[in-house]
């Protein structure tokens, strides 16, 4: 398995595009994206855990209940959530996309992202979709990734390839999300594609398995959005024997999908609103996988810890505090904590107690743009990673001005 270029159009048979249709006032910000495969695709998706769900999720869930789709249509700048006519408009987006592509409306995945509670204007979408379809290309991943952005500062793309059944299988994806990001599918959209031949049931199994290890391990601000969707389409163009059961071929596919999603997870965490640092919390030596995940997420979610990282302050006590209230049955007297970056590693806690370290060295280590928090529980063999970012003054500024 290796990472490659190409994003969501790396896989054979997929095209994508993105344009500005007029939902957003700023003409320099694209706001309508599409992904399409002429070949029929197996389809699967996971959605937000928020009880308040955007209208597009309700429509998409219905459309791919049969495990099939051929296209994705997504707008940014408006969430189409908490609107009386939201479902009607989400369905209309599917109808318009299907008409322009010459496919059935039920073969369209629809998504929206932006401000909650504002009426979604359909006129620019209706006028823009024909132009969007004309723009579709096998080099359109970047345009699509840009068109789904909201407060993101950069488009997020990743792709990988792996050998399955003697064929080269490619998996690619794009994602957005820099605020309202918290474990259990937060304000993020991710659209993945693959030319792997895989049954809808196994594709669904894979997407759930990978989400638990990647997207559900991100937290930026402990807010869970209403519109989160991770959808994947598989058109089988690689020509591998169809994956219909667990085994080596399935494991190879999951490895590639996980690599793509982990890369996108890190890109989202590092692009958190106002963020200056990507934080990676690595927990080892847990008694169970659930313990490892719980501890990692608790630390990465700690507001006080995130603020300390912004200030390059090696306040390891905030790490232990977050572990303590996580609910995980750890033994505090066994916990080791270290910080690591490109500048080196500094050990700050052993067996639950502080040890002497150089504050100057620690500040250098924590001054880098990517920081690892290394936690060893010494209780077992399980491990987990969680991803987040520092908490800065700009986070408040961005969200204070979000609707203006």
Which residues does each PLM region occupy?
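A structural signal for small-residue-enriched, beta-sheet-centric alpha/beta enzyme cores
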Residues: 1-88, 92, 98-404
């Amino acid at each position: 398995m290796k990472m490659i270029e190409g994003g969501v159009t790396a896989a054979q048979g997929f095209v994508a595009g993105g344009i500005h249709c007029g939902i957003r006032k700023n003409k320099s910000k694209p706001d309508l994206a599409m992904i399409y495969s002429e070949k029929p695709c197996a389809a699967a998706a996971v959605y937000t855990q928020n009880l308040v769900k955007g209208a597009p999720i309700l429509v998409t869930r219905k459309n791919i209940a049969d495990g099939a789709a051929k296209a994705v249509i997504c707008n940014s700048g408006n969430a189409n959530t908490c609107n009386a006519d939201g479902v009607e408009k989400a369905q209309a987006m599917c109808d318009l996309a299907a008409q322009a592509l010459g496919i059935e409306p039920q073969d369209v995945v629809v998504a929206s992202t932006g401000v909650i509670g504002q009426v979604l204007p359909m006129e620019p979408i209706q006028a823009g979709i024909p132009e969007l379809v004309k723009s579709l290309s096998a080099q359109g991943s970047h345009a699509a990734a840009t068109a789904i952005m909201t407060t993101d500062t950069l488009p997020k793309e990743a792709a990988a390839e792996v050998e399955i059944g003697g064929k080269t299988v490619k998996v690619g994806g794009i994602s957005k999300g820099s605020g309202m990001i918290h474990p259990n599918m937060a304000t993020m959209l991710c659209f993945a594609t693959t030319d792997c031949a895989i049954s809808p049931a196994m594709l669904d199994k894979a997407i759930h398995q990978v989400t638990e290890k990647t997207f559900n391990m991100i937290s930026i601000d402990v807010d869970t959005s209403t519109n989160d969707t991770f959808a994947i389409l598989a058109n089988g163009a690689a020509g591998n024997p169809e994956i219909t059961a667990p085994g080596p071929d399935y494991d190879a596919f999951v490895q590639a999908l996980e690599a793509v999603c982990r890369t996108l997870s890190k890109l989202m965490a590092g692009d958190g609103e106002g963020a200056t640092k990507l934080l990676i919390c690595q927990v080892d030596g847990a008694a169970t996988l659930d313990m490892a995940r719980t501890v990692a997420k608790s630390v990465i979610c700690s507001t006080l810890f995130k603020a300390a990282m912004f200030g390059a302050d090696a306040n390891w006590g905030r790490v232990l505090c977050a572990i303590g209230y996580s609910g995980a049955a750890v033994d505090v007297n066994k916990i080791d904590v270290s910080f690591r970056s490109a500048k080196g590693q500094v050990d700050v806690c052993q067996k639950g107690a502080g040890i002497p370290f150089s504050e100057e060295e620690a500040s250098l280590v924590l001054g880098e743009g990517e920081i690892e928090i290394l936690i060893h529980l010494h209780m077992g063999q399980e491990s987990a990673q969680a991803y987040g970012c520092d908490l800065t003054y700009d986070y408040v500024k961005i969200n204070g001005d979000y609707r203006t």
